[in-house]
Swiss-Prot record:
GO biological process: rRNA catabolic process; rRNA processing; tRNA processing
Species this protein is from: Cupriavidus metallidurans (strain ATCC 43123 / DSM 2839 / NBRC 102507 / CH34) (Ralstonia metallidurans)
Reaction(s) catalysed (UniProt annotation): tRNA(n+1) + phosphate = tRNA(n) + a ribonucleoside 5'-diphosphate
Protein's UniProt keywords contain Magnesium: no
NCBIfam families: RNasePH
Protein name: Ribonuclease PH
Function: Phosphorolytic 3'-5' exoribonuclease that plays an important role in tRNA 3'-end maturation. Removes nucleotide residues following the 3'-CCA terminus of tRNAs; can also add nucleotides to the ends of RNA molecules by using nucleoside diphosphates as substrates, but this may not be physiologically important. Probably plays a role in initiation of 16S rRNA degradation (leading to ribosome degradation) during starvation.
UniProt gene name: rph
InterPro entries in UniProt: ExoRNase_PH_dom1, ExoRNase_PH_dom2, ExoRNase_PH_dom2_sf, PNPase/RNase_PH_dom_sf, Ribosomal_Su5_D2-typ_SF, RNase_PH, RNase_PH_bac-type, RNase_PH_CS
Amino acids binding phosphate: R86, G124, T125, R126
Family assignment from sequence similarity: Belongs to the RNase PH family.
Amino acid sequence: MRPSGRAADALRPITLTRQYTRHAEGSVLSAFGDTKVLCTASVLAKVPPHKKGSGEGWVTAEYGMLPRATHTRSDREAARGKQTGRTQEIQRLIGRAMRSVFDLAALGEYTIHLDCDVLQADGGTRTAAITGAFVAAHDAVSAMLRDGQIKASPIRDFVAAVSVGMVNGVPVLDLDYAEDSNCDTDMNVVMTGSGGFVEVQGTAEGTPFSRADLDAMTRLAEAGIAELVRHQKQALGL
């Protein structure tokens, strides 16, 4: 029995609340159980230097945790004067995930800048961030179409992410903190709505995992992401 009482192949309760804040072109509160991430998407009429004059746009992300998102307070990274390696890794992952489903040429020389701020952490913050950020980006694109900034949507597919792992020899889906901190294997999987893999990050924390374990975790992730994409479509009214 999992600490949450869920079946091995069950996601936590998922909610994707759109228009959560007022000013951003897209804003979503992404909740995976007790993990809550605010994802905002801002449209900027500029591109980074390596895209200037190319006719192409860019999609990028920043990620951070509020000081009391976890059990004990942590200092703001701005107060420390530098980002941790973990923060840099996660925000690059979010950016790569979004760009995997964007036609940057169709975006034109605009940037969609995603900010993912963890309000409360209970495992799976990066996967909640990716899943919510896509919905926020979709709303930002809708705003660009409405305002005449672009003529056609640059979004080619959906993208979502979920964690899987081996806990006491059993493959499980969407780990919360209690499981994540005691698992044998921790893996994050990013996939498109059409079933393509964008990223697979997996590490054995203790006992090495077998090819059969890997296949079982991958199958769990595929099913979980298909369900998350259904949540995204439902949130967007598609």
